[in-house]
């Protein structure tokens, strides 16, 4: 199904390519998963010319609104940060997470398709606020100075 395909892509990107360390169950299933997946919506970019459904999913985002967060027991971001001020906002919330794109598809076109899908979702669900976690590749602060500076000043 679509969630399995999304989890398979996430596994390939996060664990095979970026060398994150999976749990034993994740490694055995070759899937990146958690308890939030079944409650959330999953946005997929599919290249129909690729053979096999799992291989055809080349981009993904996980999306969660208040309704899905209630089913999941909260927002994923709340497991990492205090987001009480965000949750207190009036209007519909959208948490974006677990985004990744297959290596050969990291182009402006693939990201444009993902953001077009997110925009449609935002309008469809009347989203007022968007938030989420993001990972930066690496541990050297000198190499990450530019994105960290941007987040410090504008995040």
Task: Mark where each language-model region is.
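Short amphipathic alpha-helix that is part of the acyltransferase structural core
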Residues: 1-47, 51-58, 62-65
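Acyl-donor binding region in acyl/amide transferases
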Residues: 63-155
């Amino acid at each position: 199904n679509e969630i399995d395909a999304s989890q398979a892509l996430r596994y390939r990107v996060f664990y095979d390519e970026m060398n994150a360390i999976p749990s034993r169950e994740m490694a055995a299933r070759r899937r990146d998963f958690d308890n939030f997946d079944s409650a959330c919506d999953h946005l997929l970019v599919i290249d129909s010319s690729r053979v096999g459904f799992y291989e055809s999913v080349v981009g993904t985002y996980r999306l969660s609104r208040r309704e899905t967060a209630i089913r999941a027991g909260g927002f994923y971001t709340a497991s990492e940060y205090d987001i009480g001020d965000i949750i207190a906002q009036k209007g519909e919330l959208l948490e974006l997470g677990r985004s990744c794109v297959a290596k050969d598809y990291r182009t402006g076109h693939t990201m444009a398709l993902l953001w077009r899908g997110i925009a449609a979702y935002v309008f469809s669900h009347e989203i007022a606020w968007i938030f989420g976690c993001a990972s930066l590749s690496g541990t050297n602060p000198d190499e990450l100075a530019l994105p960290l500076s941007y987040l410090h000043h504008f995040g």
